[in-house]
Amino acid sequence: MMKKIDVKILDARVGTDFPLPTYATSGSAGLDLRACLNEATVLQPGATTLLPTGLAIHIADPQLAAVILPRSGLGHKHGVVLGNLVGLIDSDYQGPLMVSVWNRGQDSFTIEPGERIAQMVFVPVVQAEFNLVNDFDASVRGEGGFGHSGRQ
């Protein structure tokens, strides 16, 4: 299913010096977001910073949201992950897309202008209404929680 989302370019380099977000393959779920920087930024171990993407979006459809997720290679190879672990973009948000990055590694990491720093995935939204009850209908699982089914 293809859905049109309004995107506003906040930095003139997006679409020229830095590519617009695109899906890398026909099976890709995420669009890569890039650091829209004027110069390289060094992220020291333990430090966090907010990086601009040069974009603003307005999803507009209350049945959709976007999540900002880390890129697997940055976290696994360099220890650079999202500062808030996952970013949530609500359908009515219209401001700039910023990415919080955290260097949880032992070494400093340099982020170059235009570097891919995160990925954005659009997800369906179901707004729930709570129904207050005194008890639940019994299920096989019941109240079994963390690790209740064993390791093997």
Swiss-Prot record:
> Molecular function terms in GO for this entry?
dUTP diphosphatase activity; magnesium ion binding
- Protein keywords: Hydrolase, Magnesium, Metal-binding, Nucleotide metabolism
Q: Which top EC class applies here?
A: hydrolase
Q: Which cofactor does it need?
A: Mg(2+)
| Claim: DNA-binding is one of the keywords in the record | no
Q: Which domain of life is it from?
A: Bacteria
E.C. designation(s): 3.6.1.23
Q: Which SUPFAM superfamilies match?
A: dUTPase-like
Statement: the UniProt record of this protein carries the keyword Transmembrane helix: no
Question: Which residues does the annotation say bind substrate?
Answer: 71-73, 84, 88-90, 98
Q: Which residues cross the membrane?
A: none
Reactions accelerated catalytically: dUTP + H2O = dUMP + diphosphate + H(+)
InterPro entries recorded for this chain? Answer: dUTPase, dUTPase-like, dUTPase-like_sf, dUTPase_trimeric
Its UniProt pathway annotation is:
Pyrimidine metabolism; dUMP biosynthesis; dUMP from dCTP (dUTP route): step 2/2
Family that this chain belongs to? Belongs to the dUTPase family.
User: What is this protein's function per UniProt?
Assistant: This enzyme is involved in nucleotide metabolism: it produces dUMP, the immediate precursor of thymidine nucleotides and it decreases the intracellular concentration of dUTP so that uracil cannot be incorporated into DNA.
The identity of this protein, by name, is: Deoxyuridine 5'-triphosphate nucleotidohydrolase
